[in-house]
Amino acid sequence: LTHNETSTGVMMSLVRPAGSGDALVVVDATSAAGGLLWDPAEVDVYYFAPQKSFASDGGIWFAACSSRAIERIEKISASKRWTPASLDLKIALDNSKANQTYNTPALATLIMLESQVGWMNEIGGLSACNARSQQSSSILYSWAQARSWATPFVADAEKRSQVVGTIDIAASADGGVDANDICAALRANGVVDTDSYRKLGRNQLRVGMFPAVDPEDVQALTACIDVVVEALRG
């Protein structure tokens, strides 16, 4: 499962599928971990890298594993089935138990991660981080719905991501503007990283709303976009 899809701005509730039996529920949580709530009882492996909500760099991998997942890792290892080291979870598990990593991670990544985790715990942990992202996303989506030329890309409000918002912009012929022109104007004035995922092929803005992003900054961004669109529309 994918807890949050970064390119499209879609999130899902994590629920163990009915009738899954002894199958493991494995979740890609790279853009969700630290910003969205989840119930450990519903999953077996929740894995991520820290470059999103944890405000660090990629290049290191973390996984929260249930006892069932650990048992499966041990069982596969005991079977002597060949597995390349890069995919051998037993190596990762053994190193984790020893408070080590198989490969040497970049020190800067760990320093930034430690700083961010400390701040996240100071403000109240995961529940507070979730609330912060929820506030930011509410600001963004409410703003878009109040504009004739902007629409949340994800139609189902329950599935709109709290941490990555995608906003469709109407075409010029429909009273809108080119989203690339909006991004260019923002970038020229020091507001960066509002570009959409190009392969999606939409006239769209994409906004990060991870816990480290102040909701007031999201509010300020919407005001900036209003000014830019007004200027572009002439």
Task: Annotate each language-model stretch with its function.
Residues 1-30, 45:
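Active-site phosphate-binding strand-loop segment of PLP-dependent enzymes
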Residues 151-185:
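Conserved PLP-binding catalytic core of the aspartate aminotransferase-like
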Residues 51-142:
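Active-site C-terminal subdomain of aminotransferase-like
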Residues 26, 40-51:
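Conserved active-site segment immediately N-terminal to the catalytic lysine
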Residues 157-164, 198-206:
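Small/polar glycine-rich anion-binding or flexible loop at a beta-alpha turn
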Residues 178-189, 221-226:
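Short amphipathic alpha-helices in soluble, non-transmembrane regions
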